[in-house]
Regions:
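Flexible, glycine-rich phosphate/dinucleotide-binding loops
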Residues: 60, 122, 148, 216, ...
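Electropositive phosphate-/nucleotide-binding environments in soluble metabolic enzymes
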Residues: 4, 96, 155, 259, ...
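Radical SAM enzyme [4Fe-4S]-AdoMet core and its adjacent flexible, acidic
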Residues: 80, 85-88, 93-208, 212, ...
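Radical SAM/AdoMet-radical enzyme domain recognition
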Residues: 1-24, 28-142
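Well-ordered beta-strand scaffold positions
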Residues: 27, 58, 203-205, 231
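Radical SAM enzyme core and accessory elements
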Residues: 215-336
Length: 336
C-alpha cells in the first residue's frame, strides 16, 4: 500500500503537468489508516483544485467529520440496490443500514454526495432514483464492463435507465434531439467526468449515465489511475500498465531532493498519458479474460475487489516504452 509520502509525491508531480482534480478510490479507501491525513495533505498542495472519495460507505459514518475537517470536496457512494435482502445477496453482508447511515452523516456534514450504481438486469432504477431524490443527491448508473460476470450480465444503459424513468416521470427535460434524449451543452457534466446527465420533471437531482460500451467516451476521457502498489493504468480497458515508482526514486532516503523525486514521477506520468490508447479494448476477448474475480464486503472490510488478468503489458519507467498515440491530444485533455 502506498504511504502518504509516496501519494504526495505523485500528486505534486501530477500538478506540475496541470492535473488538478484527484479522487481516492479502492478497494476501499476508508481502510487506509492515514486517510484523513492524506486528504488534508493533498488539499494543501499548490495546484490541487479538488480531492474526492469513492467508497462503499460501510465505514463512512465514523469518518465523515474527520473527512470534512480534512477538506474533502465530495464523496461518491457505490450502492447498487436499496433493498436490504438484495444488498445482502450482492455483498454477502447485511450492512445496508451502515451504508445509509454513512450517506446521511456525509450529507449532514455538508459534504456533496453522489450515488453510483452498476447496472444489471435486476437493477431497480426507479427505486434507486427515488432514494437519491429523497436524499437530494445526484445518481449515476454505470454500465457494467465486460469483465467476469459483465460478459453475460450487462444491459443497455440508456434503455434501462431513461426508458424506465420516462415511463414513470415522463420525458427528461433539457433535450436537444428528436431521436435521442441528449442533454444540452450547458447541462453537460461539470465534474470533469464521463457521465451524461438528464433531468426529469419533479426531480431536483441529476440522473447520470456512464456508458463505457454503448456510449463510448474514450475520445474525451481525461482519467489516469494509480494502483495501491504504485502502478499506473492509462486505461481500464487496456493491457498497458506502467511502473510509476522506479527504483531510482528512493523514498526511504529523506536526503533525496523531493524535486528530484517529483521530476522522475512526472516523467512517468507523461509517458503514461502518451501511452493512453485512443479507445479501450473491451472487445478483445484475449486481453480481458480475468483469471479470477474476487469480491467481498464485510464489517471490517478485510477484503477488496480484485481482478487478475491473463495478459498485461508492463512498461517500466526506466525503459520509457511509451506508445505515442496522439500524445498532444492526450496531454491537452488531461491537463498538461
Amino acid at each position: 500500500m502506498l504511504s502518504v509520502k509516496k501519494v504526495l509525491c505523485i500528486v505534486r508531480a501530477a500538478t506540475r503537468l496541470g492535473i488538478t482534480h484527484f479522487r481516492l478510490t479502492g478497494g476501499e479507501p476508508l481502510l487506509h489508516p492515514q486517510l484523513d491525513e492524506m486528504v488534508s495533505q493533498i488539499k494543501m498542495l499548490p495546484g490541487v483544485s479538488s480531492v474526492s472519495l469513492t467508497t462503499n460507505a460501510v465505514l463512512l459514518a465514523q469518518h465523515t467529520k474527520r473527512l470534512k475537517e480534512a477538506g474533502i470536496d465530495s464523496i461518491n457512494v457505490s450502492l447498487d440496490t436499496i433493498d436490504a435482502s438484495e444488498y445482502e445477496c450482492i455483498t454477502q453482508k447485511p450492512l445496508l443500514k451502515d451504508v445509509e447511515d454513512g450517506i446521511e452523516a456525509a450529507i449532514e456534514c455538508g459534504i456533496r454526495v453522489k450515488i453510483n450504481a452498476v447496472l444489471t438486469p435486476q437493477t431497480d432504477v426507479v427505486a434507486l432514483t427515488r432514494y437519491a431524490a429523497k436524499k437530494g443527491t445526484d445518481i449515476r448508473f454505470i454500465e457494467m464492463m465486460p469483465v467476469g460476470e459483465g460478459h453475460t450480465n450487462g444491459v443497455e444503459p440508456y434503455e434501462k435507465v431513461i426508458g424506465a424513468l420516462s415511463e414513470v416521470y415522463g420525458e427528461p427535460c433539457c433535450v436537444n434531439t428528436e431521436n435521442r434524449k441528449e442533454i444540452k451543452l450547458e447541462h453537460k457534466n461539470p465534474d470533469y467526468g464521463p457521465a451524461e446527465y438528464y433531468i426529469f420533471p419533479g426531480f431536483g437531482i441529476r440522473v447520470g449515465l456512464i456508458q463505457a460500451i454503448h456510449g463510448k467516451f474514450c475520445d474525451s476521457c481525461n482519467r489516469i489511475r494509480v494502483t495501491a502498489d504504485g502502478r499506473l493504468m492509462p486505461c481500464l480497458g487496456s493491457d498497458v500498465t506502467m511502473d510509476l515508482l522506479p527504483d531510482s526514486c528512493d523514498f526511504t532516503d529523506d536526503l533525496t531532493d523531493d524535486l528530484e523525486k517529483d521530476s522522475v514521477i512526472a516523467q512517468a506520468l507523461k509517458a503514461a498519458i502518451k501511452a493512453k490508447p485512443k479507445c479501450h479494448n473491451f472487445s478483445d476477448e484475449e486481453v480481458l479474460q480475468p483469471e479470477s474475480v474476487m469480491y467481498n464486503t464485510n464489517k471490517n472490510n478485510e477484503s477488496e475487489n480484485a481482478v487478475t488478468y491473463k495478459k498485461t503489458t508492463e512498461i517500466k519507467t526506466t525503459e520509457i516504452k511509451a506508445v505515442d498515440v496522439n500524445a498532444a491530444r492526450n496531454m491537452s485533455r488531461i491537463g498538461g
